[in-house]
Regions:
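Active-site histidine-anchored catalytic micro-motif
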Residues: 1-135
Length: 136
C-alpha cells in the first residue's frame, strides 16, 4: 500500500491552465492531464493523482452550473468506497473566491478541498502555477 496521499484534481481552466496568453476560447487552455504532463516531476511525484476535467474556461465565464458540477463530483467521490485524501481544484484567480465560498456552503464532506490558481500562465517565464499546484 502506498504511503503517498491520494489527491483528486478537478480542472476548470483559468490562467493556471492557460498556455497562449489569450482567454478567448477553450483552445487557449490545456486540459488538466496535459497541464500535469508539463509540470516538473516534483509536482506530480509526491502524491497519487487522479483527474477530472470539469471544464476549461476563463474563470469569468464560469457559471453556477459549473459550481454544481464541482459539488456533485466532489460529493460522489467523497462517498465512494475509496475516497481520495483530498481534492484540488485548478481555477482562474478572478473568481476563485466565489467558487470556494459556494463550495464551503454546500459541501458535506470532511475531506479537504483546496482551490488554487495562478497569476502568470504556464507559457510565461516565472509562472507560479506549478508551485501553487504543488503547494495545494
Amino acid at each position: 500500500m502506498s504511503s503517498k496521499p491520494r489527491i483528486h484534481i478537478l480542472g476548470t481552466g483559468g490562467t493556471i491552465a492557460n498556455i497562449t496568453g489569450n482567454y478567448i476560447s477553450a483552445a487557449d487552455f490545456v486540459p488538466i492531464d496535459a497541464l500535469l504532463d508539463l509540470a516538473p516531476e516534483e509536482v506530480t511525484s509526491h502524491a497519487e493523482l487522479s483527474l477530472t476535467e470539469v471544464t476549461h474556461l476563463n474563470s469569468g465565464a464560469l457559471t453556477p452550473e459549473v459550481w454544481f458540477d464541482l459539488q456533485n463530483e466532489i460529493m460522489q467521490r467523497s462517498s465512494s468506497n475509496n475516497p481520495p485524501d483530498g481534492f484540488v481544484i485548478t481555477h482562474g484567480s478572478n473568481t476563485s473566491e466565489e467558487t470556494a465560498y459556494f463550495l464551503n456552503l454546500v459541501l458535506k464532506t470532511e475531506i479537504p478541498v483546496v482551490v488554487t490558481a495562478a497569476q502568470r500562465n504556464i507559457g510565461k517565464l516565472g509562472t507560479e502555477g506549478f508551485k501553487n499546484l504543488y503547494d495545494a
